[in-house]
């Protein structure tokens, strides 16, 4: 049994781990790196056609985004995930493929003018559809036998609809070991989702560390904080533009906006419009409403039982076409614009930033993690000017942060989840975090008596004697 850490080692995006067992190759996630050129993603150490199966923790692009490329390169195995993840990933991967095709076409036109060869997309919509055809749903709590010597179980980890921690039982040459992959550990007390479930025991644990070096601000009333931002912007005639992940964060924000509008909390602006400018978010929102209710926390279940739609509010308008999107900027009223991508590196949000960053009355509200190298991180870091679509745009708008909406547990939350194991793991491998976060969480675990390492890409774990022993 051998495990190779491929992606998200000392970085947040590009999650991918290779498990080799009894002559078969298995992947845990195949995510896309963000904040770098997509063609610079870390290659697999094995051929795609030699991968027997993939186990997907959740549908976010940094965990699932290279599955269509895997299919394009020859993978024809099964992709195991929860039913909600299967549905969301299908939507997200087709959207990602559309982006790949559009960007490749734009680069090709530019290359042709320079007398250079055309640029091929990383993958196409057909590749995304092919990958989606490989999905095999596994329900929470169901122990599934994949092959002789390999069983898995998915448990709710509270990060995204359908997100899971995955337990693996591995048997080879008479030796059985258990390894747990945390996936992205959710924050507690978030709208819509359940809190992360604990796991009883494991020999080895691979745990994320996105916020392994920091604590979230003291719990705040997120609804009140969002209300205050809306009030401040609207009172001075501005709008609130929110770059939001189309899947997960957008639905949480719609949940909060429904409550705000129902209670008429923004004084003097009861009828403010809310524009959801993301075809992906619109489709993902439909998936949310079709899922089993056990995916939702008790509060959301209660809203559903009352006959209400928990993520719809009066004044909500979907912008599906490019014309719909452009029309938003012709609406002079104070408004909310929700658009993807959440890190501002792609999608329609970039058009809205171009039209709104230079207006001092507006607020750009950051409501999620921003990786190094992304436009979202640059805005957080106080950049005074950005380049969008060939133009230099002054950053005059207020840049604000919505606290308490993180989909990731902080250092305390991560440690509490690890501490909930009834039996201490033999070794903990810390990944999915910037170097500072990885090493800080590793140090905390070591201080508390755990054996913890923060592997780099390419590092190996042998869970049984290697040929060298």
Q: What positions do the PLM features span?
A:
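Active-site metal-binding loops of divalent metal-dependent hydrolases
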Residues: 8-9, 30-32, 84, 160, ...
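Pre-active-site segment of Zn-dependent metallo-hydrolases
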Residues: 9-12, 21-77, 81-133, 185-195, ...
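Catalytic core of the metallo-beta-lactamase
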Residues: 21, 138-197
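Metallo-beta-lactamase
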Residues: 96-160, 292-332
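Acidic, Ser/Thr-rich peripheral helices and adjacent loops at domain boundaries
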Residues: 101-104, 287-308, 375-395
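Cap/insert and terminal regions of metallo-dependent hydrolase folds
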Residues: 165, 186-277, 363-368, 385-451
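Hard-cation-handling environments
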Residues: 229-240, 244-367
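Conserved small/polar residues in nucleotide/adenosyl-binding loops
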Residues: 462-469
């Amino acid at each position: 049994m051998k495990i190779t850490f491929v992606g998200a080692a000392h970085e947040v995006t590009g999650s991918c781990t290779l498990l080799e067992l009894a002559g078969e190759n298995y992947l845990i996630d195949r995510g896309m790196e963000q904040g770098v050129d997509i063609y610079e993603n870390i290659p697999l150490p094995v051929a795609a056609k030699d991968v027997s199966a993939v186990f997907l923790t959740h549908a976010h692009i940094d965990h699932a985004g290279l599955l269509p490329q895997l299919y394009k390169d020859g993978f024809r195995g099964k992709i195991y995930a929860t039913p909600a993840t299967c549905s969301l990933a299908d939507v997200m991967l087709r959207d990602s493929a559309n982006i790949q095709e559009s960007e490749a076409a734009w680069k090709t036109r530019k290359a042709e003018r320079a007398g250079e060869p055309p640029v091929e997309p990383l993958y196409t919509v057909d590749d995304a559809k092919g990958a989606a055809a490989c999905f095999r749903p596994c329900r929470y709590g169901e122990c599934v036998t994949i092959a002789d010597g390999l069983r898995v179980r998915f448990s709710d980890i509270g990060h995204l609809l359908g997100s899971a921690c995955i337990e693996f039982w591995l048997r080879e040459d008479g030796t059985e070991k258990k390894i747990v992959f945390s996936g992205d550990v959710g924050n507690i007390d978030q709208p819509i989702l359940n809190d992360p479930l604990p796991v009883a025991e494991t020999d080895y644990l691979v745990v994320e560390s996105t916020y392994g070096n920091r604590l979230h601000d003291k719990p705040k009333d997120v609804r009140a904080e969002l209300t205050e931002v809306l009030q401040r912007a609207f009172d001075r005639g501005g709008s609130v533009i929110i770059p939001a992940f189309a899947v997960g964060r957008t639905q949480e924000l719609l949940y909060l906006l429904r409550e705000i509008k129902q209670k008429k909390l923004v004084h003097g602006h009861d009828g403010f419009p809310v524009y959801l400018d993301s075809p992906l978010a619109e489709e993902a929102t439909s998936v949310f409403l079709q899922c089993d209710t056990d995916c939702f926390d008790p509060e959301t279940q209660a809203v559903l039982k009352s006959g209400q739609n928990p993520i719809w509010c009066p004044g909500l308008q979907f912008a599906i076409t490019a014309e719909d999107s452009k029309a938003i900027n012709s609406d002079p009223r104070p408004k909310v614009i929700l658009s993807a991508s959440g890190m501002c590196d792609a999608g329609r949000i970039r058009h809205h930033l171009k039209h709104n960053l230079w207006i001092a009355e507006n607020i750009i509200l950051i409501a999620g993690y921003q990786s190094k190298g992304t436009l979202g991180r640059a805005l957080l870091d106080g950049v005074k000017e950005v380049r969008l679509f060939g133009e230099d745009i002054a950053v005059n708008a207020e840049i604000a942060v919505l606290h308490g909406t993180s989909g990731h547990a902080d250092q305390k939350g991560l440690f509490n989840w690890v501490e909930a194991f009834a039996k201490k793991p033999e070794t903990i491998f810390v990944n999915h975090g910037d170097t500072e976060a990885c090493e800080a969480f590793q140090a905390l675990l070591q201080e508390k008596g755990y054996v913890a390492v923060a592997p780099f890409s390419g590092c190996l774990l042998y869970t049984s004697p290697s040929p060298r022993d």
